[in-house]
Amino acid sequence: VIDTLTGKREMRDYQAVWMENDFIRVMLLPELGGRIHRAYDKVQQRDFVYYNEVVKPALVGLLGPWISGGIEFNWPQHHRPTTFMPVDFTQQQGEHGEYTVWMGEVEPMRGLQVMTGFTLYPDRALIEITGKVFNGNATPRHFLWWANPAVKGGDDHQSVFPPDVTAVFDHGKRDVSAFPIATGTY
């Protein structure tokens, strides 16, 4: 557990895995939990998730450091305990020109193998994200998985939910509130 930050600033390079087609360019950071750190629309010439050029951790995660920006992938609950730690990765070229990067780990809380796949297709302006969970334990394990995208808000910003969503939860399922109008403690 890391429970203090020094405030010391230093220049540092991180290993990046780049994915690119004619429409988008994506930067993945396996050293920082396998997050999408940057996603750039080459046609509109703009980032389509918030790109934070500075890695400045805050003590938000279960084991300490967490950073803002990009898209963070979380399991088994809360901001993933290993969100600021390196993950393993492998790359695959598909038979139809698609390119996939798999990032994953055996997470320490429940001993599950968790993988996130990022696929770019040559003729599409999208990132296909696939989650896989393998339980090699003798008993079932409780598990949550979600992506935490950072976007730049504004007057025209909207969050769209499926019509069957009637409740929202905080990080660890501690507090529940009605949706779309929050009531009670949250």
Where are these regions (language model features)?
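N-terminal start-of-domain structural block
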Residues: 1-38, 164-186
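Polysaccharide-binding surfaces and accessory modules of carbohydrate-active proteins
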Residues: 44-71, 128, 134-186
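Acidic-aromatic substrate-binding/catalytic surfaces of carbohydrate-active enzymes
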Residues: 16-20, 24-86
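Acidic, contiguous internal or C-terminal segments within carbohydrate-active enzymes
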Residues: 6, 26-44, 103-153
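Extended, loop-rich substrate-binding clefts of extracytoplasmic carbohydrate-active enzymes
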Residues: 1-11, 16-20, 68-126
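Histidine (H) residue identity feature
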Residues: 37, 78-79, 96, 142, ...
